Every structure is written in C-alpha cells, then in structure tokens.
Amino acid sequence: MSFIDEAKIYLKAGNGGDGCSSFRREKFIEFGGPDGGNGGNGGNIIFYTSHHINTLLYFRYKQHIKAENGNPGSSKKKSGSSGKDVIIKVPIGTQLYDEDGMLITDLNEENQKFIAAHGGKGGIGNANYKTSTNRAPRHFTFGKRGEEKHIILKLKIISDVGIIGLPNAGKSSFLASCTNSKTKIADYPFTTLEPHLGVAFIDNTELVLADIPGLIPGAHLGHGIGDKFLKHIERCSILLHIIDCTLDNIIESYECIRKELSFYNKELSNKTEFIVLNKSDLLDKKEINQKKQILSNHTKKEIFISSIKNNRYPILSTLIKQIHKKYTNTKPHIYDPFNI
C-alpha cells in the first residue's frame, strides 16, 4: 500500500432545505391557517481518527467530498429530513490546514472527531411566522448554503520510537526483527522509501516503532528523500539511532544525523536518544569494543550492540520499554484484544 502523508481536498457540506409556504386545506374549514414546515439541515463533513488507518491514501482517489443537502419542508407542518453526514476516517496525527497554510486543528487522539465543513441550516416554514396580528403569513426562508472550502491534510505519524540513521544502516532489519513489520530489506542505500510502522508487544504493553527513510547531509534542505519524512520524527517519544559499525568514521556518521535533526527542528535534538551500533557480526569483538568506547566517549551515552545474527528482541525491546516509561509522561498503550 502506498504511503501518502499530504493531500489537498475540496469539501462541500450540504445545503439546508427550504422552508415551505402552504395553508391547511380541508373540507368545511375555510381558514385553515399556515402549515408550512421547516427545511432539514444540510449534512456535515466530519473527520474521525482511527488507529486502523496509517496513510492518507484514500484522498488520492477521492479529492472532492460532498455531503447531502437537507430536504425542503412540506405542508401539514412536516419538516424536511436532514442530509446525512459524511464521516471520513483518517490516521491519528492528521493535521488540517486552510489554503493559507494556517493550522485548523490537530487530530492527535484516538476516536477524535472534528467537523471540517458545517452543513447549512434549514429554512423556516410559514407556520412559524403566524402571530396574533398576522394570521395568514406567506413568508418563509430559504435554507442556508453549506460550507465550501479547500483544505490541506498533513500526516505526522505518532509513534513511541522513531528509528533514524544513515541509509543502509540496518534500520529496516532492526524493525523487522523486533516486530512483524514486512518492510523491504536489501543491501543498498534508500531501500526504505517511506515510513514503516511496527508494533512490539512486551508484557501486554504495546510499543509503536517507526522506521524513517535514511537521512543524508543536507536532508533538511531537500537532499535525498529524508526531508519530507523528518516531520514524522517530531511526535516520537524516543529516537533510536542506528549506526553502521563498519563505517570508518562512526563519529562523523553520528554527528551527521544529529546536525540534520537540529537544522530541521532544534527540539528534535533534545529528544531522548538510544544509540545502537549495528552489523556487529561483520567485525571482530576487539574492533566492536573500540568503536563502542569511541562513540561512548563522544556522546557520553551508553552504546548498545546489535547484529542480524543476535536475537535482539528480548533485550532491546525490554530496554526500549524501560526508557519509554522513564522519559515520557504518556501512558503506555495497553493491548486490548477486544478493541477491534
């Protein structure tokens, strides 16, 4: 499935139905009086967040969205039926912008609803204008038009852990080993062309990991493909920095990513970081320990070792869970098998 994280769409809420101007006509009743009913309201267009959706792909094929109009009122004081609302499911983390780029709302919670376009109010029938001095009003009102607008949707993935690093560092392999994510894995740069999500369940606790496409120097300026996905890192609680230990200069590799994060958004460089030296099976133990010590002295952080041959799931997933509890104030996602 294609990953779409931006879309521009046209919304047209339903128009309100017109009020009715009519008079009661029955045998032997000479002056039946006004009995025109009200028009129905136009349908709204509502966005609704769901964890079952993780892309804006729907809007590639549906760029014009219209809600039903309200029906007009009729005689015998019958009100017209309201138009049906259009409810559109979007991923958690979807932001709505107007055409000028101003943020309208940020849908960052599960089952959150937002009326993006309000339907028009129904018109008033002449029965409502009857007074003691005006016993036979003919006046009625037309229904109001529904809102009509263009909006821009932008998706920022919400995940517990964002996996970052240079191209071909082994990020996708790490995600696949810790979760059931079916990401493409190959021995060449830019294998990952779009973010991938994986879910790890540890002691009935759910952790969402996001594999972000590889960053290169100048990514914040548009170099490579990482710049369009840097925004997805903003909502990660923890950054998992994967470094290829076979590189000659691992300090340069580390600082390259740190600079790109800082250039894009200074707050990204302040996030809790977890560093992993990957592909350790390609070097002997002495070389690994030397590079681990060099990186540890430079970053003043604990460095963890990983390889494709080692079972990383029990150790690293448990460690990620501990860091998540320690450094975030958010409640962990509790897996509920009945919440489908």
From Swiss-Prot:
Q: Which HAMAP family match?
A: GTPase_Obg
Q: What does this protein do?
A: An essential GTPase which binds GTP, GDP and possibly (p)ppGpp with moderate affinity, with high nucleotide exchange rates and a fairly low GTP hydrolysis rate. Plays a role in control of the cell cycle, stress response, ribosome biogenesis and in those bacteria that undergo differentiation, in morphogenesis control.
Pfam families the record matches: GTP1_OBG (PF01018), MMR_HSR1 (PF01926)
Cofactor(s) recorded in Swiss-Prot or TrEMBL:
Mg(2+)
Q: Where in the cell is it found?
A: Cytoplasm
In which family does this protein belong, per the annotation? Belongs to the TRAFAC class OBG-HflX-like GTPase superfamily. OBG GTPase family.
Q: Where does Mg(2+) bind?
A: S172, T192
Protein's recorded name: GTPase Obg
For this record, an example GO cellular component is: cytoplasm
